[in-house]
């Protein structure tokens, strides 16, 4: 029997009961062990107790800060009920991530109305027929958090049936990375080896020669243990890395963990945005190495959340703080950008620049099962990322968040910590021992990479200038060494006493960040960050409203200032900048705001990466195309640059107006293409012609494109194809490697430039199909 992925990935309707899988599940349910016979672990919430280092459960961390606690509270009071209401109103019921988020949130934020909705949904799920998956992860969470097992027995039976089916028939299958994670979750409670074996099986059958749908997009192009690149769908790739890590840790088979770490390294050192986001392409996937466009960035909210899960797991497996560095960057920036300040609007994608055309406003979409449900689940459990405990009882302080927590030390000892932290707006944190175990124990303080002059591990991004200020650590007023170990931690080992005080101070001065030179979209640009927070320029804080056209003074001071009126009080950064293309204009003051807060004040331009010099031919332009001309007469013409679109508009379009002499469209010089295009459209507005294709173009929210004149097109060839020929047509092919210009010769003929013939200018019939590449002036 071939088992379709959806039959067990997703809870299905009663109609699924007719499938062979559902019949198998039904038979197994009848023959399965009774609940009291199934061996289950203690219901105390210890979701990753099988890792070398274990997180302190979210419900055992009491947040007291003014940054994360309000967000977790809004999530509980506004966002989760909103998501539940969407699905209930749609008569679909709610399950999966939303149900899991609600279960988690109710543990720390009781809500009678939400509790009643959760109870009703659990009853409905438990009683429904033909549910192939039965929600392994939800069942695990429900039992772990509450001890309730209404969904657990069905999940166990489903897993057992799947195990039997796969081991009997071993059908060709592309593999299920999330199914592997879910099976591991189930195994953590049952300790039934076949559930772990099923998780491993999902990985082992992936990418085999007889696997169906083998491709790089679904990470099945080769066996998983041979994969070393982060490729394909970003969420699924991160999920695959999580499942590899889980299986590697639980089985002790190092190749699984090695594969996950190699893929992580590829993502972080070549394919990650400065905001911690991953995924650059419209198919929700990883792009080529160092191809990190800003206006068309994907950086899906779901992807950064799964990547945060991966980074947390890799830390728990290895103790290496570099994984927390990357996790911290992602959750403070990309993840929080995914939800509005009010908790009721969402981003699916998180671009690093916006043209302000309105497409980058957060939305409230009904019944979307992807990003919002994942985000509410993340926020509900976020406190579980703050601390961890090693096998010898060492306490890891990973995130500096005002909070209270308690740890078991030895047979009966307890260590309680009360943290007061200024983070992320200030660098000072005070950790007070409020209960001591009476025996020697270790507290490990993470020294973030950004406090050690390291923007990200691997050097994809680095600070333009290193600062001499270092982190400081003191215990009871006595200065201690703040030099971290190889994993980024300072270990304080002693017999702690009640009232002992640890003081930590990190430099949180604003810093300019530059990207690896191979990241073309960040060339001659800087981003600005302070501590873990990445900043951006947004339209309300720019005099002209043109955040995409800012040129910042690279020598201007970066001044941090608290703004109590902005979203309840955040730290902004002030610097000096001027409009690009106006070198004689004096720089003015501009205020940068935290990236995660952008698009909360209406539609308008935004940019994370800010220019530090004027454009030159070959630079990536504001619309993501290529600059190919700098106009020396900008004061007269009112434009400074010509930018070529980043892709062809057609591989074979007609010029139009064949055998028709139109008024105008005769300009050949630089600066005449835009008027030529207007003349062409006025005379022959037929869709699909070269001029119409250019005029209707919108690239990443940027319009104003036109068909270049003959001399403009010749300049484009001369200034770009020497180094960027692959960006035009099919490099190396001589057939139809010629582009239309907007310059008319006669009623029958118009100019074109042959890119396969050294850029020679020719004239040909307007009715002949040729390539089209739009340009724009700004």
Task: Give each language-model segment a name.
Residues 37-112, 132-146, 154, 176-194, ...:
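Aromatic (Trp/Tyr) and acidic
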Residues 1-3:
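Secretory targeting signals
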Residues 98, 112-134, 207, 271-280:
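Helix-terminus loop motifs that line ligand-binding clefts
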Residues 7-28:
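N-terminal export signals
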Residues 615, 632, 687-689, 703-704, ...:
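C-terminal, surface-exposed recognition/capping segments
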Residues 615-699, 737, 749-752, 766-775:
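Extracellular adhesion/carbohydrate-recognition regions
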Residues 152-170:
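Asp-box/WD-like beta-propeller blade repeats and closely related beta-sheet repeat scaffolds
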Residues 36-38, 72, 199, 260, ...:
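C-terminal beta-rich recognition modules with glycine/proline-rich loops and embedded aromatic residues
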């Amino acid at each position: 029997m071939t088992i379709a992925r959806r039959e067990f990935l997703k809870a299905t309707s009663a109609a699924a009961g007719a499938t062979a899988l559902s019949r198998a599940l039904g038979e197994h349910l009848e023959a399965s062990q009774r609940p009291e016979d199934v061996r289950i672990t203690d219901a105390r919430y210890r979701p990753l107790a099988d890792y070398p280092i274990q997180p302190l459960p979210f419900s055992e961390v009491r947040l007291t800060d003014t940054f994360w606690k309000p967000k977790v509270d809004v999530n509980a009071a506004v966002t989760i009920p909103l998501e539940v209401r969407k699905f209930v109103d749609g008569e679909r019921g709610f399950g999966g991530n939303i149900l899991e988020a609600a279960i988690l949130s109710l543990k720390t934020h009781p809500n009678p109305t939400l509790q009643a909705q959760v109870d009703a949904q659990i009853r409905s799920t438990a009683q429904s027929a033909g549910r192939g998956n039965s929600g392994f992860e939800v069942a695990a969470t429900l039992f772990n958090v509450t001890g309730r097992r209404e969904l657990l027995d069905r999940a166990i039976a489903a897993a057992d049936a799947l195990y039997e089916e796969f081991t009997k028939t071993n059908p060709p299958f592309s593999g299920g990375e999330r199914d592997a994670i879910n099976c591991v979750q189930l195994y953590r409670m049952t300790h039934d080896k076949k559930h772990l074996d099923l998780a491993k099986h999902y990985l082992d059958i992936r990418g085999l020669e007889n696997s169906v749908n083998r491709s790089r997009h679904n990470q099945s192009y080769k066996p998983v243990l041979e994969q070393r690149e982060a490729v394909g769908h970003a969420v699924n790739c991160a999920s695959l890395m999580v499942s590899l890590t889980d299986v590697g840790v639980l089985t002790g088979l190092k190749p699984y963990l090695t594969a996950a770490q190699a893929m992580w390294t590829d993502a972080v050192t070549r394919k990650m945005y400065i905001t911690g986001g991953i995924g650059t392409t419209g198919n929700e996937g990883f792009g080529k190495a160092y191809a990190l466009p800003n206006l068309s960035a994907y950086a899906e909210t779901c992807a950064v959340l799964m990547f945060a899960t991966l980074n947390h797991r890799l830390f728990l497996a290895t103790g290496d703080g570099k994984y927390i560095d990357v996790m911290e960057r992602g959750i403070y920036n990309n993840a929080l950008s995914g939800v509005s300040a009010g908790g009721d609007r969402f981003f699916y994608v998180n671009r690093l620049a916006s043209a302000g055309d309105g497409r980058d406003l957060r939305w409230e979409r009904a019944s979307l099962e992807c990003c919002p449900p994942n985000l509410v689940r993340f926020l509900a459990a976020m406190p579980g990322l703050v601390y961890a405990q090693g096998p010898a009882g060492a306490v890891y302080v990973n995130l500096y968040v005002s909070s209270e927590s308690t740890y078991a030390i030895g047979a009966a000892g307890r260590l309680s910590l009360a943290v007061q932290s200024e983070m992320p707006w200030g660098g000072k944190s005070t950790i007070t021992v409020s209960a001591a175990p009476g025996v020697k124990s270790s507290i490990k303080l993470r020294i973030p990479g950004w406090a050690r002059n390291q923007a990200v591990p691997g050097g994809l991004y680095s600070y333009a200038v290193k600062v001499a200020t270092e982190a400081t650590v003191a215990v009871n007023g006595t200065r201690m060494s703040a030099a971290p170990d190889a994993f980024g931690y300072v270990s304080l080992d002693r017999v702690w006493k009640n009232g002992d005080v640890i003081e930590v101070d990190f430099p949180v001065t604003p810093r300019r960040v530059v990207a690896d030179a191979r990241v073309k979209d960040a060339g001659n640009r800087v981003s600005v960050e302070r501590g873990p927070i990445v900043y951006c320029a947004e339209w309300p804080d720019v005099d002209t409203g043109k955040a995409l056209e800012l040129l910042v003074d690279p020598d201007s001071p970066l001044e941090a200032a608290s703004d109590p009126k902005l979203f309840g009080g955040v730290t902004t950064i002030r610097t000096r900048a001027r409009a690009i293309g106006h070198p004689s204009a004096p720089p003015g003051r501009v205020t940068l705001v935290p990236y995660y807060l952008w698009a909360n004040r209406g539609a308008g331009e935004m940019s994370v990466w800010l220019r530090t010099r004027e454009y030159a031919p070959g630079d990536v332009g504001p619309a993501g195309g290529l600059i190919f001309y700098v106009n020396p007469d900008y004061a007269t013409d009112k434009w400074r640059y010509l930018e070529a679109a980043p892709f062809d508009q057609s591989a074979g379009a007609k010029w139009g107006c064949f055998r028709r002499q139109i008024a105008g469209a005769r300009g050949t010089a630089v600066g005449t293409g835009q008027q030529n295009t207007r003349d062409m459209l006025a005379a022959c507005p037929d869709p699909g012609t070269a001029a119409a294709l250019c005029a209707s173009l919108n690239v990443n929210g940027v319009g104003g494109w036109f068909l270049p004149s003959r001399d403009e097109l010749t300049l484009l060839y001369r200034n770009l194809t020497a180094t960027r020929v692959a960006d035009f047509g099919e490099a190396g092919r001589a057939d139809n490697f010629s582009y239309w210009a907007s310059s008319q010769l006669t009623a029958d003929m118009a100019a074109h430039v042959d890119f396969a013939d050294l850029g020679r200018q020719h004239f040909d019939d307007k009715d002949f199909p040729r390539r089209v590449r739009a340009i724009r002036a700004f």
